């Protein structure tokens, strides 16, 4: 199995401030770790060069007014909200990030690789058609999925496992029955959306599946969600392409969330996603980097685990350094599983009228 990795040094130049959670070290430390592990020397890994997304592709998702605003503000610097500034030059870097997602999908379709990981920034899943938010400017995932729809795909499944609900992606596909949007996210947490009752409108009713996770949810809880919700729905939907919004802020060392996933947990989630892609879509799968702010304690190891699972490497050695593990004992809560079981039943109740697997 060959896995493509999209990366460009330009992604390291985006910076709101040196102390902002979404800073260059998120990717810089990861790339150092991947090089140290010899990932790029493997015949199973191919490095892919991104290109800038075209305005035509961006306008499939975002309004012309917002795109014009972002382009103009990017020339002098500006602000969207209290945690999302517009640094000088961000428009071109956001285009390169969105184009990186498209490049990953293109490589899979062209059979340059079986699957691909777009290691891009700035992230995108909070960006809505008319405005950016939550460190995001352009919705990379939505732009890629719209591009795939134009290639003729009729059923695409998005799995967003970022700790924060992908409200932008949800809004963009909320009334579209061609796109199954599944989100697992901590609740309560920014942006305050993603309740089970948010399940789509019009033709898209039933095609948005939100699974709130209690603080303290760890590997066992995530596997329970895959077993009881995600796999049954995906099996019934039968996607032709699977896209992963691969946020990594659900790690137990992340400074702005309260979940307890481990690097091995990420690897196992991706292994399960790859298996679903092999079952339904000839292996076609693209992961797109979203959040994740533990630049030393998590990202180098979680990204390694994700790539190892995508490329079919042995996962037995995927783990964090032992000095980080005491924080896992502090973060993980057994009570979270009890609450999660109730949440899972709520999701099944809401979606029982849409999916046979829950009847």
UniProtKB/Swiss-Prot annotation:
**Residues annotated as binding Zn(2+):** 162, 164, 249
> Coiled-coil regions in this chain?
none
* Binding note for cofactor: Binds 1 zinc ion per subunit.
Concerning InterPro entries, the annotation shows: HDAC_PDAC (IPR050284), His_deacetylse (IPR000286), His_deacetylse_1 (IPR003084), His_deacetylse_dom (IPR023801), His_deacetylse_dom_sf (IPR037138), Ureohydrolase_dom_sf (IPR023696)
Q: What is its EC number?
A: 3.5.1.-
For this UniProt record, give its keywords in alphabetical order, as a comma-separated list: Hydrolase, Metal-binding, Zinc
Q: Does the keyword Metal-binding apply?
A: yes
- Does the record carry Zinc as a key word? yes
Q: Where is this site: Polarizes the scissile carbonyl of the substrate?
A: 293
One GO biological process this protein is involved in is: epigenetic regulation of gene expression
Where are the active-site residues found? 126
**Cofactor(s) annotated in UniProt:** Zn(2+)
Question: Any idea which GO molecular function terms this record carries?
Answer: histone deacetylase activity; hydrolase activity; metal ion binding
Query: Which Pfam families does UniProt cross-reference here?
Result: Hist_deacetyl (PF00850)
- Say what the protein does: Probable deacetylase.
Q: Which PANTHER family match?
A: HISTONE DEACETYLASE HDAC1-RELATED
Q: Which family does it belong to?
A: Belongs to the histone deacetylase family.
The protein's name is Probable deacetylase AF_0130
